[in-house]
């Protein structure tokens, strides 16, 4: 009987040891994702463009090559599309957003786009209110092509800065404990990271935009398309500062490379 008790105790210790080792292993994986994990792959996919941040001179993109596939026609050097948009709910049931998109054609070495001011409504049937102003990039400066009555708005557009012009993701590889969402049938991949208000990129966003919430934001790295690269899908960054209905606040940004004929 005494022998059986010792045997049972020994087996229990072995099982407990295996369980603890398993937990430690899972914890290490969460904090330090393996090279082949989906989190590591998402970071690697984003690093192809984020390593270029900050892009001080947008016209440098004319000389930057991006991911190419069969969607490109022979001789097409491709087009970079860059966009930054800030959205905030200032009234119940309304969302106001402003932002700019530019298409930098590497064949023609021209950059055209528009600045958009938009208000969307939760109320069913109420139409979105939107105003677009055509712009172009000349000597790394934004030039407004449409007449803008509001002098302050014109100045705001001309001095607009894309997130990619001042953001820095050199430490992206050190971001830990990402919340990963995957649907390989679509396909899409997403990694979410809690960022502190002391984060350099967060500080710069708070300086540039009317972010009233004190909450620390969630950074989303979203890939729509092949995680290894595709000119059909897109990659987008989003900083979500608040999801509260009456104070929803976020900034979205993307830099993508694709065939020129798609613009």
UniProtKB/Swiss-Prot annotation:
Keywords: Cell membrane, Lipoprotein, Membrane, Palmitate, Signal. Residues 1-22 form the signal peptide. A lipid is attached at residue 23 (S-diacylglycerol cysteine). A lipid is attached at residue 23 (N-palmitoyl cysteine). InterPro entries: Csa, Csa_sf. It is a lipid-anchor. One of its GO terms (cellular component) is plasma membrane. PROSITE patterns: PROKAR_LIPOPROTEIN. It is found in: Cell membrane. It holds the Pfam family DUF576. NCBIfam families: SA_tandem_lipo. Belongs to the staphylococcal tandem lipoprotein family. This is Uncharacterized lipoprotein SAS0401.
